[in-house]
C-alpha cells in the first residue's frame, strides 16, 4: 500500500541545508543544542526505557547513536527523473556503506539518496534530501522504509514525519509535505523476503531433514507490536518449512530495545530452543530478517555463547531480491495510482 502527499516541501529553511559534504559525499545537517535539549523530555515521555535519564545521560545516548545524515548518489541529470529516498536506521560505517553501494544501480533511473538515522530529535536529514531531489527533478519521489516490519516505533516516527501518523514515536520533529512523495510499505512478509530468508538458510544447510531453523528478528519494544510481528514472521517460517523441507522452523524476536527483563526472557527462549534441539541430535541453523548484516548479530552470538549452531549473519537489505522488492513496490504503487 502506498500514500501520496500533496503540497510543496515545507517546514524548514533552505539555508539550513546549505552545508558541504564530506569526502565520501555524506551530508550531516546540524541542529542547535537548544533544539536538541528541548526534545529530551518528549523522548522521556515517549520511551519508558529512557524515562529516568538525565539530560547529560540523554546526550551521551544520542551521541553514541551517531548523527542522522544523508548520502546521495550522483545526481541523475535526466529530465523529470523520479526520486528514490531510502530511510534506514543506520548500521555503522561499514553497514551504511554496504547499503549505499548496493543501491548504486538505482541512480541510473532515480535521484537516489539514503537517509540514515532514527529521526528521534530531528528530521532535517530527510528534509534536506527531499529539497535536493526537488531541485534536481520534478518526478515522484518514492520513500522506502528499510525495516523488517511496520510494527515498530521507528517506522511510525518516519510516518509521522510524512504526516501519516498523528503522534510521534520519540519527539515532535519537523514534518514535511511533498507533492512528489509516495511512501511505500516495509517489506514485512512479502514473498520476496520469504525467498531471501530461505536463501540464507540454504546457504548453511547440508541435511534439511535433520535441521531446525530459528529466524531471529530485532523485534519492537511493545508487546502488542511484538505479537503482530511474530504473526507476520510465521508466514516466513511456513514458507521455509514448505520450500526448504526443514524439520522445524521457528520465529523469535529479541525485542532488543525493550526493557532488559523483556529481552532477557527472549534470550532465554532462544537458548532453550537451541540447546534442546541440539541435545536431541538436530543441527540448528540460525538466520534472520534483520535488514543489515552489521546489526545485532554480535549480540546474538554473545547471547548464545557455549551452544552449538550455525549462523548466517547476512542482512536482507543488501540481497539482490531486496532491490527487486523495491522495483515491484514502485510498480504496484504506479498501478494503484492509475486506478485511483
Residue ranges, per PLM feature:
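Sec/Tat signal peptide C-region and signal peptidase I cleavage site
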Residues: 9-13
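Active-site-proximal alpha-helix that buttresses catalytic centers in soluble enzyme cores
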Residues: 14-340
Amino acid at each position: 500500500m502506498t500514500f501520496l502527499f500533496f503540497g510543496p516541501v515545507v517546514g524548514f529553511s533552505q539555508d539550513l541545508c546549505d552545508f558541504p559534504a564530506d569526502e565520501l559525499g555524506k551530508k550531516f545537517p546540524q541542529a542547535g543544542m537548544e533544539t536538541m535539549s528541548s526534545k529530551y523530555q518528549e523522548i522521556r515521555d515517549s520511551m519508558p526505557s529512557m524515562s529516568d535519564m538525565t539530560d547529560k545521560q540523554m546526550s551521551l545516548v544520542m551521541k553514541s547513536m551517531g548523527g542522522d545524515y544523508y548520502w546521495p548518489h550522483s545526481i541523475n541529470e535526466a529530465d523529470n527523473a523520479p526520486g528514490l529516498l531510502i530511510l534506514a536506521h543506520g548500521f555503522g560505517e561499514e553497514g551504511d556503506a554496504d547499503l549505499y553501494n548496493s543501491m548504486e544501480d538505482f541512480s541510473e533511473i532515480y535521484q537516489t539518496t539514503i537517509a540514515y538515522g532514527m529521526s528521534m530529535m530531528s528530521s532535517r536529514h530527510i528534509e534536506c534530501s527531499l529539497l535536493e531531489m526537488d531541485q534536481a527533478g520534478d518526478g515522484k519521489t518514492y520513500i522506502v522504509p528499510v525495516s523488517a516490519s511496520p510494527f515498530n516505533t521507528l517506522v511510525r516516527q518516519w510516518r509521522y514525519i510524512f504526516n501519516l501518523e498523528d503522534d510521534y514515536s520519540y519527539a515532535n520533529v519537523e514534518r514535511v509535505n511533498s507533492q512528489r512523495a509516495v511512501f511505500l510499505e516495509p517489506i514485512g512478509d512479502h514473498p520476496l523476503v520469504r525467498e531471501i530468508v530461505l536463501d540464507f538458510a540454504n546457504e548453511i544447510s547440508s541435511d534439511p531433514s535433520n535441521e531446525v531453523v530459528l529466524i531471529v528478528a530485532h523485534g519492537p519494544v511493545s508487546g502488542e507490536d511484538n505479537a503482530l510481528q511474530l504473526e507476520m514472521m510465521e508466514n516466513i517460517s511456513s514458507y521455509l518449512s514448505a520450500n526448504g523441507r526443514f524439520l522445524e522452523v521457528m520465529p523469535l524476536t529479541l525485542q532488543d530495545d525493550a526493557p532488559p527483563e523483556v529481552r532477557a526472557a527472549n534470550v532465554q527462549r532462544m537458548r532453550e530452543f537451541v540447546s534442546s534441539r541440539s541435545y536431541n541430535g538436530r543441527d540448528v541453523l540460525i538466520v534472520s530478517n534483520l535488514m543489515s548484516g552489521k546489526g545485532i548479530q554480535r549480540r546474538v552470538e554473545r547471547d548464545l555463547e557455549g551452544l552449538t549452531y550455525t549462523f548466517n549473519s547476512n542482512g536482507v537489505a543488501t540481497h539482490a531480491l531486496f532491490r527487486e522488492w523495491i522495483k515491484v513496490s514502485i510498480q504496484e504503487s504506479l498501478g494503484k495510482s492509475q486506478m485511483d
